């Protein structure tokens, strides 16, 4: 991975009371394992395998990847990624967020969302995400303070050429959730 492909940087350190903590002043606690969140400006498709975990259709990814801002979280290799877009009227939307399956449940996606909150607070008022009605994803977002705002009927039927199944549930409607920044 080329260093030129990355721009902004945030450093995270270990667990404090069970939570990954974002360090904005670049100070680290001695001996703490480090994670980095970096903005990817070029060659975003190098992370296609990870992007496809959250959005199975490459054509759908292509619709937002070019205009979106992409971040990767590295912790001895890339563990998680997210792509956000400016939807206007103060809304920042998470279009894609995924973690390598064997590293799920370790707080990486949560760290990315907290990074987005810190990075974009003051520039946007709402962080939005659309997801399927899955027992794997809805509780995750709700634990982070997102609330359901609307349902887009038949989204996964109308926009994907094949059934999308997550955690044993066929996705039909998109559930839109929002969190104040």
Q: What is each residue range found by the language model?
A:
Residues 38-101, 113, 180:
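Acetyl-CoA-dependent GNAT
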Residues 68, 171-176:
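Short hydrophobic/aromatic beta-strand or adjacent loop that forms the aromatic wall/cage
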Residues 15, 19-43, 175, 181:
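Conserved N-terminal entry element of GNAT/NAT acetyltransferase domains
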Residues 103, 107-115:
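Conserved acetyl-CoA pyrophosphate-binding loop and the N-cap/start of the following alpha-helix
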Residues 128-130, 142, 147-170:
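Conserved catalytic-core motifs of GNAT/GCN5-like acyltransferases
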Residues 1-12:
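Positively charged N-terminal leader segments that act as targeting/secretion signals
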Residues 120-133:
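Conserved GNAT acetyl-CoA-binding A-motif
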């Amino acid at each position: 991975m080329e260093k030129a492909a990355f721009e902004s940087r945030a450093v995270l350190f270990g667990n404090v009371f069970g939570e990954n903590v974002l360090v904005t002043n670049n100070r680290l606690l001695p001996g703490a394992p480090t994670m980095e969140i970096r903005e990817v400006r070029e060659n975003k498709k190098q992370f296609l395998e990870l992007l496809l975990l959250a959005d199975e259709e490459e054509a759908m990814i292509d619709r937002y990847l070019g205009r979106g801002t992409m971040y990767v979280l590295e912790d001895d290799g890339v563990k998680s990624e997210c792509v956000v877009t400016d939807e206007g009227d103060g809304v920042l939307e998470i279009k894609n967020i995924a973690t390598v399956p064997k590293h799920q449940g370790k707080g990486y996606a949560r760290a990315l969302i907290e990074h987005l909150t810190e990075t974009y607070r003051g520039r946007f008022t709402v962080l939005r995400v659309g997801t399927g009605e899955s027992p794997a994803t809805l509780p995750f977002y709700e634990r982070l303070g997102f609330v359901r705002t609307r349902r887009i009927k038949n989204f996964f039927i109308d926009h994907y050429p094949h059934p999308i199944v997550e955690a044993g549930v066929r996705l039909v409607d998109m559930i839109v959730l929002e969190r104040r920044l």
